[in-house]
């Protein structure tokens, strides 16, 4: 049975403000608040809200329907602040049980190409955030713009993810089809789900260029060769309402998919469901691929000298930022890492949207001014310490962290090993429990002896040493108690006899 795996990305560009050279060292706020609020409210109203409402209704009407999402941490922060109704809708669709949330880098940046530790820290933060919001830790990973290579695959597998989404690029697939499940060449534990470029971009890129009907699109899926049962349709949620206006009928197209798919015997699957299946083989990806531009590589972010200079300068302080505890520095770091900052600097033809910038050189100058101020703030946190000293401290912290992680793994291994011997542990606990009452009786006997000891202290000291006195005091204690009961009567009677004699 053929299955469609639908996935949509939710990310929001954070716009930087115009920042002059003379602002360095004086102004530490880098954001265009007006443009950020305006853009996210427009996108929420025109795209996110109607698209999510449609998907929620589709989940309710069609129990077999499935859809997956991923959110960037920076985009999520903007939504929570400016458009919380979108987060509410995401939680509502999550409650249907027909949705999966994937993990991606918190900043929607390029840390996977620069610094392994920073990349791992970002992924962990986003995984924790997804768990906090939606109650379930993600099992499948999706890198920024589907960036992938074999090294990234090995890192993601080491983090515990079962699968990763990436592009079905021609230079990687060759004669192979994206309609199968593959695995990472560096680590077979990680499954690869490859995007069907043509079927995905029929919706995301070309929907309004030519009339596309849902039945025609599903006929193309149904006509794929027998055995090619995995159809991965990946795109951005802003496809509905921003890339293509709602007046184009794109939401009606989306609504019709479950009904027409059922008629053709086509089902739906979540990424984690597909990753649980067996792969047909490995795919080797020695160089970077992504879902951007015709080249399907990283040239739109790192294709010219300006982009590489900004990229290298930003990640030159990655280790310092990671170990610092300044929350404001961390927030600015997330925003400055966002991939759109580098994409605004591209000199490739055909890319026209640059935000507030007039040219790629304008974008580079503004970004480097902000980066200069940011790096000086980071360096000030370390009191002018040189790079060698800081690198030594960072290495020491990393080694200690690795040692702790190794100990945690060893503890977990031993704990699981002990669980196999539960029956013996239970019998040992029972035997210990039987011995405990006898111990309690001995302790109570000692307490009673210690209470009686003061009454016979004088006699015991005269007759026996202290060590022997503890054993012989207890029989005499009863006699002392009996004498103590009779002695008050004798004492009261003594004055009366004395008075009679007088």
Segments and roles (model prediction):
Residues 52-56, 87-91, 120-127, 153, ...:
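Generic structural signal for well-ordered alpha-helices
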Residues 92-95, 150-165, 183-186, 249-263:
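Short, surface-exposed basic-aromatic patches at helix termini and helix-loop junctions that form
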């Amino acid at each position: 049975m053929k299955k469609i795996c639908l996935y949509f990305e939710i990310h929001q560009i954070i716009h930087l403000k115009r920042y002059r050279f003379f602002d360095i060292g004086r102004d530490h706020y880098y954001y265009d608040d007006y443009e950020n609020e305006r853009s996210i409210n427009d996108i929420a109203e025109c795209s996110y809200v109607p698209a999510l409402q449609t998907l929620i209704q589709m989940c309710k009407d069609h129990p077999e329907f499935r859809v997956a999402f991923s959110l960037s941490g920076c985009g999520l922060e903007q939504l929570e602040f400016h458009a919380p109704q979108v987060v509410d809708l995401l939680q509502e669709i999550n409650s249907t049980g027909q949705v999966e949330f994937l993990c991606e880098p918190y900043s929607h940046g390029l840390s996977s190409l620069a610094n392994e530790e920073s990349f791992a820290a970002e992924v962990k933060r986003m995984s924790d955030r997804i768990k906090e919001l939606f109650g379930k830790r993600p099992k499948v990973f999706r890198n920024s713009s589907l960036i992938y290579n074999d090294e990234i695959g090995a890192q993601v597998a080491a983090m515990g993810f079962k699968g990763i989404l990436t592009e079905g690029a021609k230079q990687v697939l060759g004669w192979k089809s994206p309609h199968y499940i593959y695995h990472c060449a560096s680590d077979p534990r990680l499954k690869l789900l490859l995007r069907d470029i043509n079927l995905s971009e029929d919706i995301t890129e070309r929907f309004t260029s030519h009339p596309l009907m849902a039945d025609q699109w599903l006929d193309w899926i149904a006509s794929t060769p027998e055995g090619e049962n995995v159809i991965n349709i990946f795109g951005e949620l802003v496809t509905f309402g921003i890339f293509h206006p709602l007046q184009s009928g794109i939401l009606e197209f989306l609504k019709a998919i479950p009904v027409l798919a059922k008629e053709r015997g086509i089902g739906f699957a979540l990424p984690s469901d597909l990753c649980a299946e067996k792969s047909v083989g490995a795919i080797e990806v020695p160089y970077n691929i992504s879902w951007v531009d015709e080249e399907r590589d990283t040239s739109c972010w790192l294709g010219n000298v300006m982009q590489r200079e900004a990229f290298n300068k930003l990640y030159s302080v990655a280790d310092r930022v990671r170990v610092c505890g300044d929350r404001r520095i961390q927030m600015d770091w997330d925003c400055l890492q966002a991939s759109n900052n580098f994409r605004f600097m591209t000199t490739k033809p055909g890319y026209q949207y640059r935000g507030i910038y007039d040219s790629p050189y304008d974008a580079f100058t503004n970004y480097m001014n902000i980066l200069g101020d940011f790096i000086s703030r980071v360096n000030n946190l370390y009191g002018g310490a040189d790079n060698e000293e800081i690198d030594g401290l960072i290495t020491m912290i990393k080694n200690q962290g690795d040692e702790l992680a190794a100990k945690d793994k060893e503890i977990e291994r031993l704990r699981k090993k002990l669980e196999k011997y539960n029956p013996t542990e239970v019998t040992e606990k029972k035997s210990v429990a039987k011995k405990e009452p006898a111990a309690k009786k001995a302790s109570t006997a000692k307490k009673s002896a210690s209470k009686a000891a003061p009454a016979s202290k004088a006699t015991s000291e005269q007759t026996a040493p202290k060590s022997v006195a503890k054993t012989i005091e207890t029989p005499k204690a009863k006699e002392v108690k009996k004498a103590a009961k009779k002695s008050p009567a004798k004492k009261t009677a003594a004055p009366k006899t004395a008075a009679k004699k007088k």
